[in-house]
């Protein structure tokens, strides 16, 4: 029920927001805050609950495919924390947007809730087609928010964003359709098994189609052409969501869909690792020369996400917890900085850092909070960013000293551009005179401060994040195992029912034919899937052993039952003679 609520309730909230009056933004904001806090509470409960799954509901069948597409949600540590970022950043966006879009706040809140629902669906979908549906559904509300609430070039930014993301995902849609048509269903294990029956060249082609969609969404160099203008022209609350939550869908895709399904050659692994490091270096260098505050933060985000991609393809044992901590830390710090940059633009009337300056003197509370969040984003010891980046560096060291050294250079560059950013915005003298605009409200300051405190708490005790990877619910795994082989389960149930009623020899033969043990390839793919979804070595070994024993026991029982039935039939036939 909790998983269904987190995916479907935001869309319901968007519909309910339509009933509020456009002329009464206060009532709209109160209702939006109520929904926002409720969704954050649900996401926290989801993290505490551990791995869980809904019942797999048959949705529809793709023409030419053997199996059906399921509405099936599954939560693991990585997905649960991404949902927390989605709901948390959306709540802060609703809070900051209340003071920025007073006259049209209702429409702003409607689009935010629709975007939240699509993001949550992306991070919780266990069916590949369902995942792709939500993956693409994120584009529409985000584009509407950019076009309706963005800056001077908002229409160009919205068009660029939509074209890049939709065109980048088109090859994945074709590849997914082809792969689903070869598989029993569109769940991870079935897709992985179907892929094994294809020749290496086709496997590589399908892999590239999937990779392209995730490379564009993250984005990774050279597929980043949409990012700078989109983040700059989008309203600051949306920019915070784009960088803090929506961009994580790309990295999430690498972990949850690429690694479990596709066999990766070392050439692909090395290529992706160095592409991530190139992105990290490129983003840091572009941030060093940026004068637009939001573009600087966009390139900074690109650099950190490039480091996360490199960490994913280090494929070390510590990869998943390292990348998870880095993603959570980046989501909180980058999101907070975009919110603050939006408040600075509202106050000073510009986001050009050369024309800002002296905000610490003109607005001391804002200046103090801005400096506090900037220091936290530098990944100093004691912060979540430090834990995430240090553990990713250790993961890269497993691939050799050179990748780790390149990543270390990125961290030095990040310190350089962030210190320059702070110096230009809150210290010195402004390059022009301006009348003070709207100041940061107490609610805005409190919500952003909480994000900063969370970075400190998670830095002191990162187990708050990584423990979610160890929480284990057997019922969720049983449900997952049940739907990975739906055809075999249905056939087995049908045959057993027939055996009870007919007792015919050919039915007994069917029992023995259907009740086949899981092959080593099946078990290997299942182990890879469980590992990618955060299960520990002990949990995976225990589950695989149980499934193997259950499978062998069921086969033995089926054959024994068939033999006994055949013997009875022979005896009955001889008596009749």
Go through the PLM ranges and name each one.
Residues 92-100, 106, 116-129, 141-390, ...:
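Hydrophobic transmembrane alpha-helices and their helix-loop junctions in integral membrane proteins
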């Amino acid at each position: 029920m909790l998983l269904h609520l987190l995916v479907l309730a935001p869309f319901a909230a968007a519909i309910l927001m339509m009933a509020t009056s456009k002329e009464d933004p206060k009532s709209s904001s109160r209702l939006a805050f109520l929904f926002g806090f409720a969704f954050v509470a649900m996401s926290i409960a989801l993290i505490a609950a551990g791995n869980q799954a809904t019942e797999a509901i048959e949705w529809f069948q793709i023409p030419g495919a053997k199996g059906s597409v399921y509405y099936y949600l599954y939560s693991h540590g990585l997905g649960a924390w991404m949902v927390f970022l989605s709901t948390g950043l959306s709540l802060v966006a609703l809070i900051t947007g209340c003071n920025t879009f007073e006259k049209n706040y209702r429409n702003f809140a409607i689009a935010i809730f629709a975007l939240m629902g699509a993001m949550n669906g992306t991070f919780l979908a266990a069916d590949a087609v369902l995942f792709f549906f939500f993956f693409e559904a994120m584009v529409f509300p985000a584009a509407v928010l950019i076009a309706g609430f963005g800056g001077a070039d908002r229409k160009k930014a919205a068009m660029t964003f939509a074209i890049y993301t939709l065109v980048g995902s088109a090859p994945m849609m074709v590849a997914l359709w082809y792969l689903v048509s070869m598989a029993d269903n569109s769940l991870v294990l079935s897709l992985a098994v179907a892929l094994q029956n294809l020749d290496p060249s086709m496997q590589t082609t399908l892999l590239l189609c999937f990779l392209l969609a995730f490379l564009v969404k993250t984005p990774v160099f050279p597929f980043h052409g949409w990012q700078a203008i989109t983040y700059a022209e989008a309203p600051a609350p949306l920019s915070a969501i784009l960088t803090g939550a929506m961009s994580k869908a790309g990295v999430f895709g690498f972990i949850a869909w690429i690694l479990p399904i596709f066999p990766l050659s070392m050439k692909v692994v090395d290529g992706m690792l160095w592409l991530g490091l190139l992105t990290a270096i490129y983003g840091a260098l572009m941030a060093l020369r940026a004068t637009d505050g939001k573009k600087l933060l966009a390139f900074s985000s690109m650099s950190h996400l490039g480091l996360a991609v490199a960490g994913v393809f280090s494929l070390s044992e510590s990869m998943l917890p390292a990348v998870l901590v880095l993603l959570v830390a980046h989501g909180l710090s980058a999101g907070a900085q975009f919110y603050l940059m939006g408040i600075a633009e509202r106050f000073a009337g510009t986001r050009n850092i050369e024309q800002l300056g002296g905000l610490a003197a003109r607005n001391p509370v804002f200046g103090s909070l801005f400096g506090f969040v900037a220091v936290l984003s530098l990944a100093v010891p004691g912060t979540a960013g430090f834990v995430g980046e240090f553990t990713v560096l250790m993961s890269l060291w497993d691939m050799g000293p050179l990748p780790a050294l390149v990543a270390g250079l990125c961290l030095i560059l990040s310190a350089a551009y962030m210190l320059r950013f702070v110096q230009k915005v809150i210290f010195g003298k402004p390059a022009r005179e301006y009348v003070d605009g709207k100041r940061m409200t107490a609610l805005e300051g409190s919500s952003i401060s909480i994000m900063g405190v969370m970075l400190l708490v998670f830095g002191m005790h990162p187990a708050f994040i990584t423990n979610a990877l160890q929480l284990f619910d057997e019922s969720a795994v049983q449900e997952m195992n049940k739907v990975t082989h739906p055809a075999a389960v249905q056939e087995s149930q049908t045959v057993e029912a027939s055996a009870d009623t007919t007792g015919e020899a050919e039915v007994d033969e069917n029992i023995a034919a259907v009740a086949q043990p899981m092959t080593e390839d099946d078990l290997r793919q299942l182990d890879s899937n469980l590992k990618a979804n955060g299960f520990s070595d002990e949990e995976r070994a225990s589950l695989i052993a149980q499934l193997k024993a259950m499978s062998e026991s069921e086969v033995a029982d089926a054959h024994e039952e068939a033999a006994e039935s055949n013997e009875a039939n022979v005896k009955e036939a001889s008596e009749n003679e």
